[in-house]
Swiss-Prot record:
Taxonomic superkingdom: Bacteria
Gene responsible for this protein: cobS
Organism: Pseudomonas syringae pv. tomato (strain ATCC BAA-871 / DC3000)
Pathway: Cofactor biosynthesis; adenosylcobalamin biosynthesis; adenosylcobalamin from cob(II)yrinate a,c-diamide: step 7/7
Molecular functions (GO terms): adenosylcobinamide-GDP ribazoletransferase activity; cobalamin 5'-phosphate synthase activity
Protein name as annotated: Adenosylcobinamide-GDP ribazoletransferase
NCBIfam families for this protein: cobS (TIGR00317), PRK00235.1-5 (NF001278)
Cystine pairings recorded for this chain: none
Taxonomic lineage: Bacteria, Pseudomonadati, Pseudomonadota, Gammaproteobacteria, Pseudomonadales
Length: 243
C-alpha cells in the first residue's frame, strides 16, 4: 500500500508520513492510486457538506470551497497559476514558456485566472447545494485525478529529472489503463446520466488542453498537470450545476 500513501501525501495536505524514501518503481505505481485519492477527498468533502447542513447557503459554499482548496494544499492551483502566466508570457515559444513556469512569482494573469476559476467553482457549489446534488463533490475529485493518470499515460513528460520524470518512466501502463476504465465505470455507477455527461464534457476538455500542451511544449509538466486537474474539476461541477 506504499504507493497509495505516496499518492495521498503528494496530492494532498493530509499529515501522511512515509517510512522512507520511495523507490522510483513505487513512485510510478503511485499514479495508479490517483483516482482512489480523488475518492478519499470526495468522501471527505461529502462528509463536510453534511456537517454544514443548515448553514447559510453562501457561507456553506464558501467553507466547502475552502476545505476543497485546503485538502490539496493549493498545489494544483499553483500549477494553474504558473501555467496561465507561462501561456500568455511565453508568446508561443517553448523554452520561454517552460522558463516562466519555473518562476515562483505570480503575474496579473495568474491572479485573474485563479479568481475566475475559484469564483466559477464557488457559484457551481452554490447551485449544487441548492439542488441537493452533492454527488459532484465526489465526481470532481475522482475525474480530476483520473485525468492526471490519463495525462501521464498518453503524454510525454518534458522536464528531465525530478519526481515527474520518475512518475512517467515507472508508470505501469497496462494497469493504468485498467484503473482508468474502472474509474470511468465508477463515475457512471455513482451518478448515472449525470456522470456520463460530466465524463463527456471532461473528455472534450482533456483533449483540448492536451492538444494545447503538445502544440506549445511537446508534452506536459507538473504545472500543466495541476492546471488540467483544476480545470476538469471545474468542468465537472459546472456541468452538474447546469443540468
Amino acid at each position: 500500500m506504499l504507493p497509495f500513501w505516496i499518492a495521498l501525501q503528494f496530492l494532498g495536505s493530509l499529515p501522511i508520513r512515509l517510512p522512507g524514501m520511495p523507490r522510483p518503481a513505487e513512485l510510478g505505481r503511485s499514479l495508479l492510486f490517483y483516482p482512489l485519492v480523488g475518492v478519499v477527498f470526495g468522501t471527505l468533502l461529502l462528509g463536510f457538506n453534511a456537517l454544514l447542513s443548515g448553514a447559510p447557503l453562501l457561507l456553506h459554499a464558501a467553507l466547502l470551497l475552502s476545505a476543497w482548496v485546503l485538502l490539496s494544499g493549493g498545489l494544483h492551483l499553483d500549477g494553474l497559476a504558473d501555467s496561465a502566466d507561462a501561456w500568455l508570457g511565453g508568446f508561443g515559444d517553448r523554452e520561454r514558456t517552460l522558463n516562466i513556469m519555473k518562476d515562483p512569482r505570480s503575474g496579473p494573469i495568474a491572479v485573474v485566472t485563479l479568481v475566475v476559476v475559484l469564483l466559477l467553482k464557488f457559484a457551481a457549489i452554490v447551485a449544487l447545494i441548492e439542488s441537493h446534488n452533492s454527488i459532484g463533490l465526489l465526481l470532481a475529485p475522482l475525474i480530476g485525478r483520473s485525468a492526471m493518470l490519463a495525462l501521464f499515460l498518453g503524454t510525454p513528460y518534458v522536464r528531465s529529472g525530478g519526481l515527474g520524470q520518475a512518475l512517467a518512466d515507472h508508470l505501469p501502463r497496462s494497469l493504468g489503463r485498467k484503473v482508468l476504465l474502472v474509474s470511468t465505470v465508477a463515475c457512471v455507477v455513482l451518478a448515472g446520466w449525470s456522470g456520463i455527461a460530466a465524463l463527456l464534457v471532461c473528455a472534450v476538455c482533456f483533449y483540448w488542453l492536451r492538444h494545447m500542451m503538445m502544440r506549445r511544449l511537446g508534452g506536459s509538466t507538473g504545472d500543466t498537470a495541476g492546471a488540467l486537474l483544476e480545470l476538469l474539476e471545474l468542468a465537472v461541477v459546472l456541468t452538474l450545476a447546469l443540468l
